[in-house]
Curated annotation (Swiss-Prot):
Catalytic residue list: H92 (electrophile), E164 (proton acceptor)
Main location: cytoplasm
Function: Involved in the gluconeogenesis. Catalyzes stereospecifically the conversion of dihydroxyacetone phosphate (DHAP) to D-glyceraldehyde-3-phosphate (G3P).
Lineage: Bacteria, Pseudomonadati, Pseudomonadota, Gammaproteobacteria, Oceanospirillales
Primary gene name: tpiA
Involved pathway(s): Carbohydrate biosynthesis; gluconeogenesis; Carbohydrate degradation; glycolysis; D-glyceraldehyde 3-phosphate from glycerone phosphate: step 1/1
Keywords on record: Cytoplasm, Gluconeogenesis, Glycolysis, Isomerase
Source organism of this protein record: Alcanivorax borkumensis (strain ATCC 700651 / DSM 11573 / NCIMB 13689 / SK2)
Listed name of the protein: Triosephosphate isomerase
Reaction catalysed by this enzyme: D-glyceraldehyde 3-phosphate = dihydroxyacetone phosphate
GO CC annotation terms, alphabetical: cytosol
InterPro entries assigned to the protein according to its UniProt record, in alphabetical order: Aldolase_TIM, TIM_sf, TrioseP_Isoase_bac/euk, Triosephosphate_isomerase, Triosephosphate_isomerase_AS
Top-level class of the enzyme under EC nomenclature: isomerase
Family: Belongs to the triosephosphate isomerase family.
Length: 247
């Protein structure tokens, strides 16, 4: 099955308005086949939607598991949709590790995002200790299963899953193309047990120190449909090169 490649730039807590302008100018000249999404920090979401070409999607890096109410500092899915977001990253390893997000919370965020019309980008991944102990497949499929059990497999007809090995996030280490492909294939096969058609159509992204010089080999793998890009998404030239590698 042909799946449209997607490259999402996760700026994390980086960037200023001048980066929005620089990136918008660069993406205005991009006419490739890959779908492109930019995920800046909360304060820049509306400005990003105004600045970016219409074909570029805007995503949030997080969302509340609550609809509304007395939750100081939280941002709801309907609010994100109202300012022009079409996507939201859910369950990033930094959210799990630094803020203690649980599988149950992540599943709730996933459901709230979809209810507001947002496309969740669900992140799964293992630590180096878990990989070294041979538990990679158990961990990542368990993280996926927690959400499938909560929302149903049909929800993944309009979702994206990103495999981000925790040991490769911001470390300069990258899973080899073969290592990444093996996990992506495992995730697709795992979901196929519930629904083969959804499993085949689901886009699986790789995230973990993807750069312009290693993107093409990663994206050439049969079950890798693009990338969730961190540091390399903060420079227009490198991000465009990665988008081109995904075509």
């Amino acid at each position: 099955m042909n799946r449209t490649p997607l490259v999402a730039g996760n700026w994390k807590m980086n960037g200023r308005k001048d980066l929005l302008t620089e990136m918008a100018d660069a993406l205005a000249g991009y006419a490739g086949a890959a779908e492109v999404v930019i995920c800046p920090p909360f304060p820049y979401l509306a400005a990003a939607r105004s600045a970016m070409p219409g074909a570029v999607g805007i995503g949030s890096q997080n969302v509340s598991e609550q609809e509304d109410g007395a939750f100081t500092g939280e941002v709801s899915a309907p609010m994100l949709a109202e300012v022009g977001c079409g996507y939201v990253i859910i369950g990033h390893s930094e959210r799990r590790a630094l803020y203690g997000e649980t599988d149950a919370q992540i599943a709730s965020k996933f459901a709230h995002a979809q209810a507001a019309g947002l496309v969740p980008i669900l992140c799964v991944g293992e630590t180096l200790e878990e990989r070294d102990s041979g538990n990679t497949d158990t961990i990542v499929c368990g993280q996926l299963r927690a959400v499938v059990d909560a929302v149903g497999v049909a929800a993944f007809a309009n979702a994206i899953v990103a495999y981000e090995p925790v040991w490769a996030i911001g470390t300069g280490k990258t899973a080899s193309p073969e290592q990444a492909q093996a996990v992506h294939a495992c995730l697709r096969q795992f979901l196929a047990k519930d629904d083969p058609d959804i499993a085949q159509s689901l886009r699986l992204l790789y995230g973990g120190s993807v750069k312009a010089d290693n993107a093409a080999l990663l994206f050439a793998q049969s079950d890798i449909d693009g990338g969730l890009i961190g540091g390399a998404s903060l420079t227009a030239d490198s991000f465009i090169a990665i988008c081109q590698a995904a075509e």
